[in-house]
Amino acid sequence: MKQDSQSENESIVCDLSVSEDQRNVKFFSDLQTPIPKHLPFFMDVTLRDGNQALRRPWNLEQKETIFKQLLKLGVQGIEVGFASSNNQEFEACKYLSSIAPDNVVISSLSRAVEKEIEVSWKAIRFAPKPRIHIVYPVSAFTIQNVLKISPEKVLDRISQSVAYAKSLVGSKGEVQFSGEHFGDSLENLDFAAEAFQIALNNGADVVNLPNTVERYRPWLFVSMVKAVANLLPEDTRISIHTHNDLGMATATTVESYFAGAVQLETALNGLGERAGNTNTYEVAIALHNCGVEVPLNFSTIYETSRLVSYLSEIPIYEKAPLIGEDVISHRSGIHQDGVAKTRHLQKGAYRAFDAALIGRPEGDRIEFTNQSGKSAVYCILKDAGENITLEEAGRLQPILKKISEDLGRRELTLEEIRIEWNRLLRAI
């Protein structure tokens, strides 16, 4: 998949945070990135990779609840499970395939074993858009130390398994091949590219380049994606599947999209093995902020995160990007002043995203601690319906700061702030 040059692509990132005057400055225009012509295709892996990492994997009823929420969110593809792993998985894959809408790709994972591939096909064949997903290692380390076979046998296994899967799906479905541990194949990148080409030659419709274990910086992985993409046919549909072992999965996935990846494999709440998979919400909003048209229903993100947290029995970290309870709070006086002065603008001084966009019930939240200034006092009481001036807020701020310090530097409640405000009013 060779990339369009900037001169060939008229769609340039439209960053709403930058004025038109700034856009015209030479140094800024040089940093603009062409927006890919293809829309991102979100292939959700919550029901497979996310589910297999849970302490208590979901039952069919819970899987159906997640499945329907994914449809509400608007993902274009759903990997419903690993059909050959056990009978419960098979039945879940079969049932979810039977209720899938016409416009959503339904996938089941399988190892490169014909018997397992056949089970996957039996489970999903009645879906309107079925896809068999085959995974097999391509990194030298895994081939030598886990498979313990020759590279030639690896290529032969890929060829046979993909061809067999293609013979099953025919023109009705698709085949995806994942080169497991692609992110660890820098030392044998030519071999990995050959493996993907063989998969394509035998009927693969999508090739997936996973960062199965995140060990290195995003730039290195993205460079590997570019290198392989340039060796494959121009119309190759490249997929990315990144894990979050070092906390960089979102960055890696976003940059891989700009490097040519069409399909982005992500999970709700970032669920997945070890530190999880790429978080769907983070990738979606990051691309949106870069001017990319993202075909998801953003307004369902917040409710989706709460539902997934409840069903997975995994609490949402209060500082989790976008969905954490505390990520819209501001406590520093400098920050609060900037928030207060830009609340009415589309771009906030300290606001990375619009809370309403993702369905959060409230926007910027200003709290008072001993680090807060008069802007916090003014905004808190003004929002509560009190008639207060900035001058009065300035007089009240040191009183509240002293109380906060006396109480162990804790945050003050609205009621505590109001009590001191009323005392000040009586003294005026």
UniProtKB/Swiss-Prot annotation:
Belongs to the alpha-IPM synthase/homocitrate synthase family. LeuA type 1 subfamily. Its main location: cytoplasm. This is 2-isopropylmalate synthase 2. It is an enzyme of class 2 (transferase). PANTHER family: 2-ISOPROPYLMALATE SYNTHASE 1, CHLOROPLASTIC-RELATED, HOMOCITRATE SYNTHASE-RELATED. Homodimer. Its cofactor is Mn(2+). Its EC number is 2.3.3.13. One of its GO terms (cellular component) is cytoplasm. Pfam families: HMGL-like, IPMS_D2. Residues 40-302 form the Pyruvate carboxyltransferase domain. One of its GO terms (molecular function) is metal ion binding. Keywords: Amino-acid biosynthesis, Branched-chain amino acid biosynthesis, Cytoplasm, Leucine biosynthesis, Manganese, Metal-binding, Transferase. Catalyzes the condensation of the acetyl group of acetyl-CoA with 3-methyl-2-oxobutanoate (2-ketoisovalerate) to form 3-carboxy-3-hydroxy-4-methylpentanoate (2-isopropylmalate). Has high alpha-isopropylmalate synthase activity and low citramalate synthase activity. The keyword Manganese applies. One of its GO terms (biological process) is L-leucine biosynthetic process. InterPro entries: 2-IPM_HCS-like (IPR050073), AIPM/Hcit_synth_CS (IPR002034), Aldolase_TIM (IPR013785), IPMS_Lepto (IPR054901), LeuA-like_post-cat (IPR054692), PYR_CT (IPR000891). PROSITE patterns: AIPM_HOMOCIT_SYNTH_1, AIPM_HOMOCIT_SYNTH_2, PYR_CT. The lineage of its organism: Bacteria, Pseudomonadati, Spirochaetota, Spirochaetia, Leptospirales. It catalyses: 3-methyl-2-oxobutanoate + acetyl-CoA + H2O = (2S)-2-isopropylmalate + CoA + H(+).
